Amino acid sequence: MRRARRPLGPPFVRVLLLAVALGLGLWPLAADAGPWLRRPGNTYLQLSYSRIAAARIFSPDFSVQPLGASYEQHALGAYAEVGLIERWLTASFEGQLFRYNLLVDQGATYGLGDLRLGFWTGLVEKPVRLAAAVLLGIPSGDSSPSAGPGADAEGTLIARTLPTGDGEPDVELRLSLGHSFGRARRWPLEHYLVAEAGYWFRTRGRSRDLAGNLSFTDFSDAFTYRAELGTKLPFRFLDRFWFILRMTGVESFASSIDASRTCATGLGNGVTFNAYGFEVAARIWKGLGLSIGLDSAFRARCVAAGVNLKTGVSLEF
């Protein structure tokens, strides 16, 4: 962790509220296998960069409050999926290969973020697509970053509010419904529609207090959802682009009291958000693609009140 060059001052108390945004933040633009599973051997790879900057946070009562400092998160992410068994099994992987958290002029932490493995199976193929998934969260990030040898209590406290992971293994069960339509004489536009719902089983998060002792937090389960509409225009060159509107959300079952505790610990229990997003995905050449998108929460608690920018390059083969 890089230490500050100036004293924290009174606003630091409010900066502690940033912790949940650091532990989880606003989820990046959604990526998953969805209802269209891959054929055996068919592979999709994506490398992405995302950035969020904020000077405000959604507090435990859903109001927007100032942080008292500027926060930035930069992340290098990876997503992959590969078909294993026709219709019945597609595997996915996603995670942050490198995550950099910064409180401007105060300190920063960096390292590997949390990872997630997914296993998807097809349930229905016609007239709509329906798939089910099991998603396994791996706590590979650091839930208790160190300020380094010889750091004082204040430096250690800053480091603890800038985790790269939540220290908690978890499991999510998800259903994904999809349908593609259009490209007809009376309606030449091409569309796809996806609706997903999941139940997120949370477990116990592990971290360390300022004295270095192990501490544990029981996470409350959550309901997750995603709705997405993609549109492609029937014009030369423009038919290489998908224009995507998206709504995503997490509704934690934690009480506001529980959420207020974790807003000051960075472990992420109680995180709730409803966010809208827009993305443009382009096919450049054969299986090579590029994408850029934005998303932002309009209702949330314990999440940074800022816009998340994500760009990515993908390869399908």
Residue ranges of predicted features:
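Outer-membrane beta-barrel biogenesis signature
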Residues: G25-F58
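Transmembrane beta-strands of outer-membrane beta-barrel pores
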Residues: Y49-A55, L84-W88, G95-N101, L136-D142, ...
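Outer-membrane pore/translocation modules
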Residues: R99-A222, A264-G268
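Transmembrane beta-strands of outer-membrane beta-barrel proteins
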Residues: T43-L47, L89-F93, L117, L130-V134, ...
